[in-house]
């Protein structure tokens, strides 16, 4: 066990274009092989495209998409007496945001549009409207937690 206490939390730098820490977090999730300028171009292009397509503020669209994708419950494996149970637990706020961003970017990469900018834009628009694969992932996660509610007393 470390004796120095908990590690200090990292402060997220505010995005220079939109002034939102969520945009910075999205850029960092899109980032591959340290190419931050490429990731910024993809994210800014997707947000501009979402603004042109929906007519709404892109940061509002991003927040609405995240709210529709953030899970409130998830299952964690817990081993009790030789059997492994899927125990439903509540998700902390920071983890739910991280999971939502991870799912949005992951399902954007799996889409069939030509460029990553288009894929991310369409996934954000779909998620903000309550559609898309990332929203389905959240529903599946909640369904799994609901079906394993009988093991909730194993929570730690």
Curated annotation (Swiss-Prot):
Keyword field contains RNA-binding: yes
A Gene Ontology biological process term: translation
Keyword Membrane listed: no
Recorded hits in SUPFAM superfamilies, A to Z, give: Ribosomal protein S7 (SSF47973)
Question: Mind naming one GO cellular-component term on file for this protein?
Answer: small ribosomal subunit
Q: Which family, according to the similarity comment? A: Belongs to the universal ribosomal protein uS7 family.
Query: Can you name one GO molecular function term for this protein?
Result: tRNA binding
Report what the protein is called.
Small ribosomal subunit protein uS7
Relate the assembly described in the record.
Part of the 30S ribosomal subunit. Contacts proteins S9 and S11.
Protein purpose = One of the primary rRNA binding proteins, it binds directly to 16S rRNA where it nucleates assembly of the head domain of the 30S subunit. Is located at the subunit interface close to the decoding center, probably blocks exit of the E-site tRNA.
User: What keywords were assigned to this record?
Assistant: Ribonucleoprotein, Ribosomal protein, RNA-binding, rRNA-binding, tRNA-binding
The family database entries (Pfam families) matched by this protein are listed as:
Ribosomal_S7
The record's annotation in Gene3D superfamilies points to:
Ribosomal protein S7 domain
Alphabetized InterPro entries for the sequence: Ribosomal_uS7, Ribosomal_uS7_bac/org-type, Ribosomal_uS7_CS, Ribosomal_uS7_dom, Ribosomal_uS7_dom_sf
